[in-house]
Amino acid sequence: MKKGIHPEMKLVTVKCACGAEHKFYTVKENVRIDVCSSCHPFYKGAGAAGMIVDTEGRIEKFKKKYNLE
């Protein structure tokens, strides 16, 4: 990498709207976010486990369409 052309990375504390704080490196001085892993429904258990996937009849429709048994 060339010296002097890349921005300097800084360790900053990011504050979420829920009040949680996370630290990571960025070129910005401060960062504010609305949703983080502490308050997002997917990470709180309402995501993958709480999602309802409608697959009723799709496999049967596919098999019927292509004459598969």
From Swiss-Prot:
GO terms for biological process: translation. Its cofactor is Zn(2+). One of its GO terms (molecular function) is rRNA binding. Zn(2+) binds at C16, C18, C36, C39. Binds 1 zinc ion per subunit. Belongs to the bacterial ribosomal protein bL31 family. Type A subfamily. Binds the 23S rRNA. This is Large ribosomal subunit protein bL31. It comes from Thermosipho melanesiensis (strain DSM 12029 / CIP 104789 / BI429).
